């Protein structure tokens, strides 16, 4: 398999200087998004239609919620399902009926496709429509794909939120302008942003996904969309098709990124720059103070970012500009130029960007560079550690609350911690 992938690998440099690679990949699938989404939407349930491997992945990654039943499960496809010996739709209907009878608290059910369900062409969109009609109005059933075929793991959230867009209510014709923050955020971060938006004078603010399915925000031409994550391409497109307008901004990582993100929203709502600066100044100062101790530890250290989560470019901007790290290479699975238009000019001149993945070639470049820190997926971390390189799991940067002023120090600490561990082990 490695030999075949290597033979088919393509590496090219585009006129814009981005190294584009198409070869062997090393990624988690979109099912991983359930780990944080099932905690966010409190009356939703995620039913994966997949194999035992899918079940092991979700169970291992998410664990079991203490003192509560988990809000995810797997309808396991057996060999007879794959062989077409039974009607998979009948089996799915039976499982959903059992689930909803046992869990009356479920108000929103996601049928999540996987590699096996896509291979046998199981039409989960028709199943979702059929089941939604059957269990309406108490339960709404939607579907999306968490398959790992030609995707990366954060696309699971994008697919989930894109599935919600068609069922968002339409705002009234005379609705006043509203702000929709898109992307799953920890509740504590969401609450911080709500307070800051209110202090800026923006009070008509909603978040997608909401904490409960009954709180789906109304959208329309007067809705301004502010992305909290850079990997929400399908969701942004679906919102724009419904008349929403996206605000271009850097992403809220670090003090600088958060300030620019909030300022872009304020500008779209006509808030004066003087008021924005007065409001944000003490918050920026607090973030600066938190970052100072980590800057002393990390400044001048060299970092290599493998393509994995799609947040690599905002992370690189934060590490270079606010922490003083040197960027050896910044890889990203997909380079969405429109969504990253405010980020790309903020990277240091001459930064090596790579889009896509050819893991063997990237490993060769990483080994040759011998950076102080490697940000990569779990599958690469242990082998690189065995070779004497210090690593940081990129997936941890998705699980952990890192957005906003108050979390700037926590974000920096995530990069300082593995280097500190390495120092202690060397003593």
Curated annotation (Swiss-Prot):
Its EC number is 1.3.7.7. Keywords: 4Fe-4S, ATP-binding, Bacteriochlorophyll biosynthesis, Chlorophyll biosynthesis, Iron, Iron-sulfur, Metal-binding, Nucleotide-binding, Oxidoreductase, Photosynthesis. It catalyses: chlorophyllide a + oxidized 2[4Fe-4S]-[ferredoxin] + 2 ADP + 2 phosphate = protochlorophyllide a + reduced 2[4Fe-4S]-[ferredoxin] + 2 ATP + 2 H2O. SUPFAM superfamilies: Helical backbone' metal receptor. InterPro entries: LIPOR_BchN/ChlN (IPR050293), Nase/OxRdtase_comp1 (IPR000510), Protochl_reductN (IPR005970). Pathway: Porphyrin-containing compound metabolism; bacteriochlorophyll biosynthesis (light-independent). Its cofactor is [4Fe-4S] cluster. Gene3D superfamilies: Nitrogenase molybdenum iron protein domain. GO terms for molecular function: 4 iron, 4 sulfur cluster binding; ATP binding; metal ion binding; oxidoreductase activity, acting on iron-sulfur proteins as donors; oxidoreductase activity, acting on the CH-CH group of donors, iron-sulfur protein as acceptor. The keyword Metal-binding applies. The keyword Lipid metabolism does not apply. GO terms for biological process: light-independent bacteriochlorophyll biosynthetic process; photosynthesis, dark reaction. Protochlorophyllide reductase is composed of three subunits; BchL, BchN and BchB. Forms a heterotetramer of two BchB and two BchN subunits. HAMAP family: ChlN_BchN. This is Light-independent protochlorophyllide reductase subunit N. The gene is bchN.
